Amino acid sequence: MKKILYVSCLCSPSTLDNLFSTASHKPALSIQKFHRLLVEGFAMHKDTCAVQTLSAIPVTPASHKRRLWRLPSDMACDIKYNYVPTINLPIMKNLLVFIIAFFKAILWSLRGGRKNKIVICDILNVSISAAALLACKLTRTKAVAIVTDLPNLMIGGLRQGGLKRKVHNRLTSALMFNYDGYILLTEQMNQVVNVHSKPYLIMEGLVDVNMAAADNLVTNKSPEKIVIYAGGIYEKYGVKKLIDAFMQLKGQDLRLHIYGPGEMEKDMPDYMEKDSRIMYFGVVANNEVVQKQLQAALLVNPRSSIEEFTKYSFPSKNMEYMVSGTPIATTPLPGMPMEYYPFVYLFEDETVEGFHKTLKNILAKPKEELHEFGHKAKQFVLTHKSNVVQAKRVLSLFEEV
């Protein structure tokens, strides 16, 4: 049986709910969902593996005033969540996380022998992944990197540049070439990250197998035709073009609901004043967004397909959209395999006029046709991209490492 230590910032659902509700600056939740789905996928393979986490507590001085953080381990879905205590101050936090995580990873690797043990590291969490990687090198334990973004192309988190970003990017880049295997979002990533041709797996995303039980019924749809965008609200992500295109649509029954953080937050009041059909909800809990998606007519991802970073990303929102059973309209992103194309509507013209035309055509379709199209997308991702299926593929990768 494989024993897996999952190193990231992942929290149990109850711990995350507490951190989210007490945060003065609400964090994006997509990376938490990505990691939790994979870990829960491992936990569903009880006969072949056992998984526990080693997690940096995802707090910053900007999000929480509390300085000393020491959280007890907790259990959820047969997963033990272990948290690294720290002091929530610049530099001090990262140093403490590195030191404590290093010794915890050493102890985990040596306790009971190294046989059949493997460590998975989220390389974008530099302090804790660097500590775990060093521990693995010293104990000769295999370490696999999970790469959800490339440091020098990140739009999230460290957007404003400066010394902090440069240090983060250099450390991440220096470390990411030293793993024994890689879990990547796109094939293009492999050319950049896997310079030593180690075993790797392309896993562009995953969906919650439990969504099979979530009913998406025509009778439960909102009486208005709601279009939802949930994600980072950045002009570079195509959000401004989406809004401009929507404002050209005619129909008082149409709505555009926007969820998420980003640089365009400050512009939202102006857009809502110009067009009362537009509503901005900020950052809300993921389960609330999922419920709203079930009631919507269309889910959209306007991210530009010509930006360099799109070669190395597959937005988790596309997977979340598809498993909801509500149809999705997206740009033809380079990182999206062709197998997805029959199950999504495409913005083939990525101008404001092109977005407007595509939205107009889709929203004119009968609701039954939209519902059937969304249902086929849901069945596709549940069959081929569920967290149980993807976790099994990762377990197969471990045999090659």
Predicted features and spans:
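A charged, aromatic-enriched C-terminal amphipathic alpha-helix characteristic of glycosyltransferases
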Residues: 364-398
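Conserved acidic donor-binding segment of nucleotide-sugar-dependent glycosyltransferases
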Residues: 342-353, 361-367
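Donor nucleotide-sugar binding/catalytic pocket of nucleotide-sugar-dependent glycosyltransferases
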Residues: 34, 144, 152, 169-215
